[in-house]
Amino acid sequence: MPKPIALSRNPSTPLFQWRAYYEMTKPKVVALMLLTVLVGMCLAVPGVVPIVPLIAGMAGIGMMAGSAAAFNHLIDRRIDGLMARTYNRPLPKGRVSIAKALTFSCSLGILGFVVLYVLVNPLTAWLTFASLIGYAVVYTAYLKRATPQNIVVGGLAGAMPPLLGWTAVTGEFHGNALLLVIIIFAWTPPHFWALAIHRRVEYAKVDIPMLPVTHGVEFTKTCIFLYTILLAIACLLPVLVGMCGPVYLVSSTLLSVTFIYKAWQLKFHEEPGMAMKLFKFSIYHLMLLFIALLVDHYLWL
């Protein structure tokens, strides 16, 4: 009986190399980010999004986001190798060399910038470049190691995608787009602090001053709870300015109440693994919130 053919796991094979580069772009994170870009595009126009800024904008922003993620892998390669969550990443494991990782990161970023500049508009290209620098350099290379408020200050770069989507279609700033930025900005600290509680021993081992390491777990739980309340208020802003209708209002209220309740449980009635459960819920919260924005927008056209 013939033996089944097994896929090669030789690091030198093209398939294995491709998977390593793909992993460096943090595809799941970029996918969630692109959802917020798409919502920003759709809310910027009353009807259908023009095809060129839609495709070129999503592609260019996606490439530059992947480039920022790859730079994050490159800069954090030493501490990644010491943490259980990240030790198996391509650079710590030697699946990609430093030189190749740098070449890949730069090439992907440059290609994304050119696509945005030529096919979309210069404003979106430069704003996306600023976001890349904010995440890869300001946050990863400096803030992450400098202050327990790293997530709060550095979160602005990660909150930009809806604005990028908006400018890709309109070519200009708009206050409504900034409201979407505020939502993600308020969402970021409780999202990452929940993970930091779960991984606080590892962060302490590599001298990363995450809030649970520097100020303790109980203080961090309090901050998470307060930020979920702040997030709930931020989520109401699109309704208050007339951007959204009842579908979004009901959806965001249910999501906010659930997030606050789970943060309350973490603070006052913690069970084993509660921080990680909150972290995972926060991902669904953001995803469902922006889907609700999209549904509400087109439902009332």
Swiss-Prot record:
It is an enzyme of class 2 (transferase). It is a multi-pass membrane protein. The chain crosses the membrane at residues 29-49, 51-71, 96-118, 123-143, 151-171, 177-197, 223-243, 244-264, 281-301. GO terms for biological process: heme O biosynthetic process. Pathway: Porphyrin-containing compound metabolism; heme O biosynthesis; heme O from protoheme: step 1/1. Its EC number is 2.5.1.141. It holds the Pfam family UbiA. Keywords: Cell inner membrane, Cell membrane, Heme biosynthesis, Membrane, Transferase, Transmembrane, Transmembrane helix. It is found in: Cell inner membrane. NCBIfam families: cyoE_ctaB, PRK04375.1-2. Converts heme B (protoheme IX) to heme O by substitution of the vinyl group on carbon 2 of heme B porphyrin ring with a hydroxyethyl farnesyl side group. This is Protoheme IX farnesyltransferase.
